[in-house]
Amino acid sequence: KSPAKTYPLTDKSYLKLDTPVYVDVPGGGERTYLFWGFVKNIDRGDEAALKALGLILSDKIIFDVREKQGLAYRMTATSAVRDDKALFYISLGTRPQNAEVLLPQFESLMSRQTLGELSEEDVQKTINMYLGRMMFRRLSSINQAYYLGTSLFFENEMNHDKAFLDALKAVTLEDVNRVADKYLSAENAISIVVR
């Protein structure tokens, strides 16, 4: 059995926001980079359902911003879990004139309404596509060593990666709806604009 986690490198404290944060950094560049997100405390056991929720949100938000509106090409929109926190965020680069169009949309994009009417088939398709990519990444010996090593280092459990993927396989539509209702409301959002 692994010893208790006492590695100074991975012990961390998190920013505790009690008010929204807005940072606007003038840079004079030809591109503007935007980050918007919010942090939620989460319950143990919700990690896999939050991953599935993040994957679904990513597909829907990126389709809206990139394909329907044509306002960004390279972007990220998802949730990231670390310890007992989840960061729901959108990050992208765009033309400077698009920043004022996009910023007001972020809260409504990263919300329950974006999910719309999901089916169990939608959830399973999204999870299976992700699992397929993850299995492909783990084919080579060097990548297997990487995932075992990072699981041991960051989680103090060498098989954490495999256990997480197994938990993700078991996520259902009910789980996704439950965590969406529980966590998907922006409070004290962080907005960062680098122009």
Predicted regions span which residues?
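Active/ligand-binding-proximal structured segments within catalytic/core domains
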Residues: 36, 45-58
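M16 family metallopeptidases and their MPP-like homologs
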Residues: 32-43, 66-170, 187-195
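Short amphipathic C-terminal alpha-helix that caps PH/PH-like domains
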Residues: 1, 53, 57, 103-111
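Periplasmic-binding protein-like
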Residues: 61-64
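Short, exposed beta-strand-loop hairpins at the edges of beta-sheets
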Residues: 180-182
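An aromatic/glycine/proline-enriched structural segment found at the starts
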Residues: 1-41
